Amino acid sequence: MKETLKLICFNFIFYVLFILFSLIGIPVFSAIVAFQSIFISHRNGMKKFRRAISWYGLVIIKALPYPFVKVIYEDLDKTKTAGPFIFTSNHRSASDPFLMACLPYECVQVVNIWPFKLPILGFMAKLAGYLSVREMPFEEFSKKATGLLNEGVSIITFPEGTRSADGSLGQFHGSIFRVALETGYPVIPICITGNDKIPARGTLLLRPGTIKIHKLSAITYDEYKGFTPYKLKNMVRQLIADEIEAMEGKGNA
C-alpha cells in the first residue's frame, strides 16, 4: 500500500509539473526565440527553435521525474564524424521522443500521426518541421528529409514504426535507409533500455527506474554505399540488438 501511494504521488506531482511547465515554458521559449529571430536569419531562427524544443525535452525527462527516474546518456561514438546525421533508435515507450533531447544536435524527428494531434506539442512539432512518414508518399518524404539534411539538420527516426509491446526489437521499415543511400549522410544507431514502463504501452503511469541511452559509432557512407536498403536496415538493427543485449546484461549483473 505504501509503495502504491508513493507511485500515485509521484505520477500526480510529475503530471502537474509537466502541465505547468508546458503552459509556461513553451510560451516563454517561443517568445525568446521569436524575439531573437528579428535580428537573425530564418535559418538561424529555426536552429534556435529546434534547440529550444530539446531544452524543453531535457527538463521533462531529467528534471521533473528526478529522483524517481534517472536518465543516463552515453556517447560511444569515437569516430568524430561530421554531421548532420540520420539517427535510428529502437522504440519501447511514449517517452522515447522526449529522450532524444539528450542528443546535442539540431534535430527533427520522423514521427507517427498521433504526436501531431497533441495540444500545443503537435503544433510545435509541425512548426519545427517534424515529418510524418505515414501522411506522405515516399518521394515527398525523401525530398523533405533530404532538404533538412542538406541544411545541416539531423533526422531522428524510430524505424520499428511503433512501440514494442514486450520490449523485443521489431522489424525495421526501410524508408529512412533509402534516404540514407540517396543522400550519403552518416547513420548513427541509438539504443534505449530501462523505459519499458516509463510509461508502459497503453498507460500513462510512470514507474521508477533508470533509463540508459547509448549513441553508437557513426556508419559512414563509405561503409554502406554498396548496400541495399534491406541490407543496411538489417545491419543497423543487428547493431542495436547487440548493444541492447549488452546494456541489459550489465544492468542485470
Regions found by a protein language model. Name each.
Residues 5-8, 139-253:
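Non-catalytic C-terminal accessory region of glycerolipid acyltransferases
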Residues 75, 90, 111-112, 158-159, ...:
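A secondary-structure boundary/capping signal
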Residues 1-70:
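N-terminal membrane-anchoring alpha-helices
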Residues 58-61, 100, 121, 145-146, ...:
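Short amphipathic alpha-helical segments and helix-helix/interface helices
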Residues 75-80, 146-150:
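Short amphipathic alpha-helix with an adjacent loop that forms part of the alpha/beta core around
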Residues 30-55, 66-67, 79-137:
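Catalytic core of membrane glycerolipid acyltransferases/transacylases, capturing the structured
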Residues 66-74, 136-139, 195-197:
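Short gly/ser/thr-rich secondary-structure transition/capping motifs
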